[in-house]
């Protein structure tokens, strides 16, 4: 049987699958269930400085290409999130499943404080969300838009905590490699790529957007090629592990993401139809693919596309 164990920044994962932030990462019981269903690590929903109700309904819609959402970073605030994370960590520890805690902030100067509060729960890693695409009307241009602003946020978080940090980047920028280099230079231990892709759906019969917020973030199968390209590009310019997220719903999808250069593979929208059981399904399919193709472990696949990209078919 192929070995799925991953050493990620000194953190042991039983397999490379990660519950992506924003999907089921809202309560200890739900995150524990994901762990029991076979996820390698769980990421909590992003927490900010204070409670947010998010956008008005409708905020999400499943469609043939995946999911579009404009939930709007609904969260209880970092202080209220702290006991949730503490309880989650307590439940996950006996299962050998690490906890990644996601944070965001509306202002540069707030990131350090949110990180300090969340660090009290002792998560295994803090994921810094600087790239949510559907709150620009509230917070302005995302910090992920430029290398300078992304680096400034990373610097604030790095000064505030000693925990490993992963910065979550956006796909809709022209200089993704430059931004990746900038956050690593300021202390990012890893990079998460990608966040959802800005998009819009219209109800032609009603002649209006399907979301109350008008636009939202696309996820699911439709964005997998975008995510693969982003992970491939980032892995060529920085020497830190990448959590590749976007459009993963099968073992083949996971294998492709690892071949593009990802160390871990985030799973999100696939849970809309498959529920937490999707983690076991993907792991089984990944192992079967590796067995059939002669891969003994994940390292033998990681980044393989870089070595074969110019081969003649």
Region locations from a protein language model:
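N-terminal capping/small domains of soluble enzymes
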Residues: 1-99, 104-106, 282
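Alpha/beta enzyme core
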Residues: 32-37, 106-243, 251-262, 267
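Short low-complexity, flexible loop/linker segments enriched in glycine and/or proline
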Residues: 57-60, 141-143, 206-209, 279-283
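Alpha/beta catalytic cores of nucleotide-metabolism and tRNA/nucleoside-modifying enzymes
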Residues: 1, 218-239, 243, 249-313
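Short gly/pro/ser/thr-enriched loop/turn and capping motifs at secondary-structure boundaries
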Residues: 48-53, 133-135, 198-201, 271-274
């Amino acid at each position: 049987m192929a070995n799925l164990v991953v050493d990620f920044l000194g953190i042991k994962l039983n397999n490379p699958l990660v519950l992506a932030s924003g999907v089921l990462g809202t309560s200890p019981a739900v995150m524990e269930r994901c762990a029991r269903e076979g996820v390698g690590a769980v990421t909590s929903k992003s927490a900010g400085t204070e409670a947010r109700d998010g956008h008005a309904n409708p905020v999400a819609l499943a469609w043939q290409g995946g999911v579009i959402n404009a939930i709007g970073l609904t969260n209880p605030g970092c202080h209220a999130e702290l006991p949730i994370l503490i309880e989650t960590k307590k439940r996950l520890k006996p299962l050998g499943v690490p906890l990644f805690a996601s944070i965001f902030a509306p202002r540069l100067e707030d990131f350090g404080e949110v990180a300090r509060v969340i660090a009290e729960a002792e998560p295994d890693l803090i994921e810094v969300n600087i790239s949510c695409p559907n709150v620009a009307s509230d917070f302005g241009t995302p910090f992920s838009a430029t290398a300078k602003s992304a680096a400034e946020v990373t610097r604030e978080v790095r000064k505030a905590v000693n925990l490993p940090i992963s910065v979550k980047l956006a796909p809709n920028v022209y200089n993704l490699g430059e931004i990746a280099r900038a956050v690593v230079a300021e202390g990012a231990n890893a990079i998460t790529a990608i966040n959802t892709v800005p998009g819009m759906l219209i109800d032609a019969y009603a002649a209006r957007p399907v979301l109350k917020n008008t636009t939202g973030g696309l996820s699911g199968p439709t964005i997998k090629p975008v995510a693969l390209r982003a992970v491939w590009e980032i892995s060529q310019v920085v020497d830190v592990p990448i959590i590749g997220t976007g459009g993963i719903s099968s073992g083949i999808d996971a294998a492709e993401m690892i071949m593009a250069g990802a160390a871990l593979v985030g799973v999100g929208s696939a849970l809309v139809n498959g529920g937490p059981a999707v983690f076991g399904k993907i792991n089984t399919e990944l192992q079967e693919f590796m067995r059939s193709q002669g891969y003994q472990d994940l390292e033998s696949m990681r980044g393989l596309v870089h070595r074969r990209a110019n081969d003649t078919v």
